[in-house]
């Protein structure tokens, strides 16, 4: 079993325990989705950054909760560090540019992509749907993983199917791994980043 999971917290508005988020994501990948091979990046961003991504890549105004970039069938070439430093201004061959140098490969293997999440939107949506922002954040990770698995939410029937699967996985996750501790404060130095390589 091998996989690479990188998590970057580029926002400070909401304190997120990135170690717990890593654990939750690994439970989803390995135990609930039975993924043995994966290269996944999760990037937590603030609303202004998510708004720019949403407008640039989806053509929608304002922020959104989660955007998924699937690198599995694109065959991107390795990008240099200059592209990583460029952030949102990076060449569009790798859409978000957050972790492009780490994740882009000539020969994609297994589940391969990047999930960008706006934590402030999780807080806002949690209030609207009367749930915790931690559960909403876990739902966004699940949503992104399902997109990487091939689920589509553009049409009504497909959207309902995806929502059902999100709910099922969220319930199963809650039984296996506590979600609420995502709110716990953890010491951070500079840009919080946790990488995991399992084999």
Segments (PLM) and residue ranges:
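An acidic/histidine-cluster motif and surrounding catalytic segment
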Residues: 1-138, 146-199
């Amino acid at each position: 079993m091998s996989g690479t999971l990188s998590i970057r917290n580029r926002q400070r508005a909401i304190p997120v325990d990135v170690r717990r988020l890593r654990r939750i994501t690994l439970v989803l990948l390995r135990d609930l989705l039975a993924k043995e091979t994966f290269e996944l990046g999760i990037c937590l961003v603030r609303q202004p950054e998510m708004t720019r991504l949403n407008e640039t890549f989806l053509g929608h105004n304002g922020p959104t909760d989660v955007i998924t970039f699937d690198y599995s069938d694109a065959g991107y070439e390795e990008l240099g560090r200059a592209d990583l430093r460029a952030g949102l201004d990076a060449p569009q061959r790798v859409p978000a540019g957050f972790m492009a140098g780490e994740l882009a490969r000539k020969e994609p293997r297994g589940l391969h992509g990047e999930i960008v999440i706006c934590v402030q939107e999780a807080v806002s949506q949690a209030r609207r749907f009367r749930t915790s922002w931690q559960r909403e954040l876990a739902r966004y990770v699940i949503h992104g993983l399902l997109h990487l698995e091939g689920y589509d939410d553009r049409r009504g029937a497909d959207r309902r199917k995806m929502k059902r699967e999100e709910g099922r996985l969220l319930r199963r996750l809650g039984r296996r791994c506590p979600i609420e501790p995502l709110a716990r404060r953890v010491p951070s130095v500079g840009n919080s980043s946790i990488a995991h390589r399992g084999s």
